[in-house]
Structures are given as structure tokens and as C-alpha cells.
Regions:
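An extended, acidic
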Residues: 2-134
Length: 134
């Protein structure tokens, strides 16, 4: 992971498809954190590798509906890659991703990946913006 002085220097990685993550909520979170750089938008879960290698700093996959459950195969490898690079991956509530309950992350809501030292600040901003949606 890239070493940054704080979240104001961070770059988001996000999905190209608005149906995969709430771009509006993500923009509100960026504003709350003081992030002004344009997001790196890409398809696939290569976003995890992008974060791990330092091409981005924060990956948010924000729920677009309460009923949607992420698939474990979309996130298991990325979770490991980011952790091994020194980052942290949780859901939008700050809970670790639970890969033990079947094919989906049914105990989780969304995904947040960020450097360990900045992850808590990102989670607080996510909770503030999402409120009852999370």
C-alpha cells in the first residue's frame, strides 16, 4: 500500500457501474474526508490489487439496496491481498468480512478497504453518510 500523510491525499477506487456501488454516497464520503482527487473507476475486483499496489488508497463498495448480498468469490482474494499489503478490509459498519456462512457475505453490508491507520476515519465518514442505510 502507498504511504500517504492523510486522507486528503487519498484516491478512491470505485466501480464503473453505478449499480454496483452508490456513487452519490461515495462522493459525499469523499467530501466529508476532504478527498478532492478524481476516483479511479474500473470494473472487476482488480480494485483490491490497485489498492494493494498503491494506485489507489480507498475502495468503497457501498450497498445500493438492503437486500443485496455480496458474493464471497468477489471478495475473498481481494481481502487477503489488501491485508497482506498492510491494509484493512471490513464492511461499512467496520465488521470483518465473514466468509464462513456460505456463498454470500450475508452478515455484512458493503465493503471498505483502506490503509490500516486510516480505516477507522473512513468508517466513521461512511457511517455518517449512510446512517440508517447501512
Amino acid at each position: 500500500m502507498r504511504k500517504i500523510g492523510g486522507l486528503k491525499e487519498a484516491t478512491f477506487c470505485e466501480s464503473v457501474e453505478a449499480g454496483h456501488s452508490s456513487h452519490g454516497d461515495q462522493a459525499d464520503i469523499a467530501k466529508k474526508l476532504g478527498i478532492t482527487k478524481p476516483s479511479v473507476r474500473m470494473d472487476s475486483q482488480a480494485k483490491y490489487a490497485s489498492i494493494a499496489r498503491g494506485a489507489g488508497d480507498v475502495y468503497l463498495r457501498l450497498p445500493t439496496s438492503k437486500s443485496y448480498q455480496e458474493k464471497i468469490w468477489d471478495h475473498a482474494a481481494g481481502d487477503l491481498i489488501v491485508k497482506e499489503a498492510g491494509g484493512m478490509v471490513t464492511d461499512v459498519r467496520g465488521d470483518k468480512l465473514d466468509f464462513s456462512v456460505g456463498r454470500t457475505l450475508q452478515n455484512n453490508s458493503g465493503v471498505v478497504a483502506a490503509p490500516k491507520e486510516l480505516h477507522g476515519e473512513v468508517i466513521e465518514a461512511v457511517k455518517s453518510v449512510l446512517g440508517a442505510k447501512a
